[in-house]
């Protein structure tokens, strides 16, 4: 998302509060993977220390056997060792979360508000609906993670820290997959270099 699109989306989400929109806000403010957001429980959020603990992920597993096609929603461990992490809970997100946490039990899932998690495909479908309503060109849920990473780079976040926040095992993954400099960022880079030599 461009900065303008992200601002429009955040404005829309804040004016249309619901559990699924909360999931989109969490992604934009943390860069969490869709399965991690769906697996997030209230007990994973520490408002006092300002951290979110990521220890689980949710995904749908398709069963391959001779019978009819079937699948099941499973709770699993994160992707890599680096995916087990604590990430910062910024004040803006903490304020949003506090509105939802009042009515929730610690073992309930943040997005569903219940004892069972939200299906990742449900979040993907919801995001597409919001993107359509806002006229956004980006339609892939994972693009929210890319948007977070790009904003961090634009804000001069060092790559090692960003890689740790995203749960990557090495910095090259972050740079190769998630950093998308736009023309304005490229222009600023060249202008800064020119200013340093003249």
Where are these regions (language model features)?
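Basic, Lys/Arg- and aromatic-enriched nucleic-acid-binding interface segment
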Residues: 1-34, 38-40, 48, 59, ...
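Hydrophobic (often cysteine-bearing) scaffold residues that line and stabilize catalytic clefts
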Residues: 5, 19-20, 119, 123, ...
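Active-site/catalytic core of tyrosine-dependent DNA strand-transfer enzymes
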Residues: 2-6, 67, 88-137
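Short, contiguous acidic/charged loop-to-helix segments that flank catalytic cores in large enzymes
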Residues: 12-15, 74-84, 111-118, 135-143, ...
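Exposed loop/turn and edge beta-strand positions of beta-sandwich/beta-sheet ligand-binding modules
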Residues: 20, 48, 83, 105, ...
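C-terminal catalytic core of tyrosine-transesterase DNA break-rejoin enzymes
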Residues: 25, 29-36, 126-133, 143-169, ...
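Catalytic-site neighborhood detector that most strongly recognizes the C-terminal catalytic loop/helix
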Residues: 58, 94, 166-192
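Conserved tyrosine-mediated DNA breakage-rejoining catalytic core shared by Y-recombinases
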Residues: 3, 39-99
């Amino acid at each position: 998302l461009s900065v303008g699109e992200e601002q429009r989306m955040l404005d829309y989400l804040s004016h249309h509060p619901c559990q699924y929109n909360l999931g989109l806000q969490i992604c934009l403010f943390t860069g969490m993977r869709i399965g991690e957001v769906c697996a997030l429980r209230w007990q994973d959020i520490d408002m006092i220390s300002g951290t979110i603990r990521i220890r689980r992920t949710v995904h749908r597993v398709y069963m391959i056997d001779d019978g009819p096609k079937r699948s099941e929603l499973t709770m699993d461990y994160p992707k890599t060792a680096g995916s087990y992490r604590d990430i910062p809970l910024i004040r803006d997100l903490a304020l949003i979360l506090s509105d939802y946490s009042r009515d929730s039990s610690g073992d309930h899932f943040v997005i569903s508000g219940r004892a069972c998690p939200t299906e990742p495909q449900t979040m993907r479908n919801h995001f597409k609906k919001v993107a359509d309503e806002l006229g956004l060109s980006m339609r892939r849920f994972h693009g929210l993670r890319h948007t977070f990473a790009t904003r961090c780079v634009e804000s001069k976040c060092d790559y090692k820290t960003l890689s740790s926040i995203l749960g990557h095992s090495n910095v090259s993954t972050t740079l190769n997959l998630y950093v998308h400099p736009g023309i304005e960022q490229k222009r600023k880079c060249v202008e800064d270099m020119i200013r340093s030599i003249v």
